[in-house]
UniProtKB/Swiss-Prot annotation:
This is Hydroxyacylglutathione hydrolase. Zn(2+) 2 binds at residues 63-64, 141, 179. The keyword Zinc applies. Keywords: Hydrolase, Metal-binding, Zinc. GO terms for molecular function: hydroxyacylglutathione hydrolase activity; metal ion binding. It comes from Prochlorococcus marinus (strain NATL2A). Its EC number is 3.1.2.6.
Length: 251
């Protein structure tokens, strides 16, 4: 159980091949982030006797919205929060947001951060430390453990600028990505920087966790600043070179 503020907790539900659906719980209520499929999420919520208050959608891909419509059939009062620019691709949204919007859920203030790159109109959700013991970021497919999302719709410049935005958050921000890619990303980073002690140590640590059936996530922004080559790329040219190299790389 993570991200505590009294009974404020965040839980992972592992689905599909490598997706993670994060469930943020406060008292008897829950918020779900990017539900790929409905079955495991619905089962988990019902077993815990939780009421679904909202679903946060970072972008339109099926492995992020695939379970939403079934979940809102079970909990029709739940809000579906998504970018107002994505009405066509997320037509079932009921609470539309834009860059820098701030809204409240379950006694927490959430800020919307527009992060183009992986897709157009991709958004991230940020909860500041005044509402929890640490800052919390749900970046969707923009920022991963040791990596970033592929550029499926956006440009290198857009993704570089999006990562710059996220890198400006406080270093104690906990990062809750939507995929378990950390091991592969760190192996790739180590292939480029084989003497990087921070990457070596982090890879060993998360491999031990994975061997025990644990998740490598969440990470922290502080940790990513030491080991995420995309996040610390000094310019767009360097970022573009890294992204092209990663796209061709095979573990």
């Amino acid at each position: 159980m993570l991200g505590k503020k009294s009974d404020f907790t965040i839980h992972p539900i592992n689905v599909l091949q490598d997706n993670i659906v994060w469930v943020w719980v406060h008292n008897c209520n829950a918020v779900v982030v990017d539900p790929s499929i409905s079955g495991p999420v619905e089962k988990w919520l019902l077993e815990k006797n939780l009421s679904l208050k909202a679903i946060l959608q970072t972008h339109h891909h099926d492995d992020h919205i695939g379970g939403t419509q079934k979940l809102i059939k079970t909990w029709p009062e739940a809000k579906v929060v998504a970018s107002k620019k994505e009405h066509k691709r997320i037509p079932f949204q009921t609470f539309s947001v834009d860059d820098n919007d701030i809204f409240n859920l379950m006694d927490a203030e959430i800020k919307v951060i527009e992060v183009h790159g992986h897709t157009d109109n991709h958004i991230a959700f940020y909860i500041s430390k005044q509402n929890a013991k640490c800052n919390i970021l749900f970046p969707g497919d923009t920022l991963f453990g040791g990596g970033c999302g592929r550029l499926l719709e956006g440009s290198p410049v857009q993704m570089f600028e999006s990562l710059y935005k996220l890198n400006s958050l406080p270093e104690n921000t906990e990062i809750y990505p939507a995929h378990e890619y950390t091991e592969s990303n760190l192996k790739w980073a180590l292939s480029l920087e084989p003497g990087n002690i921070s990457i070596i140590e982090r890879l060993k640590l998360i491999q031990k966790k994975l061997q025990k059936g644990m998740s490598s996530l969440p990470s922290t922004l502080s940790e990513e600043r030491k080991t995420n080559l995309f996040l610390i790329a000094e310019n767009v040219e360097k970022f573009t070179m890294l992204r092209k190299h990663k796209d061709r790389w095979k573990c």
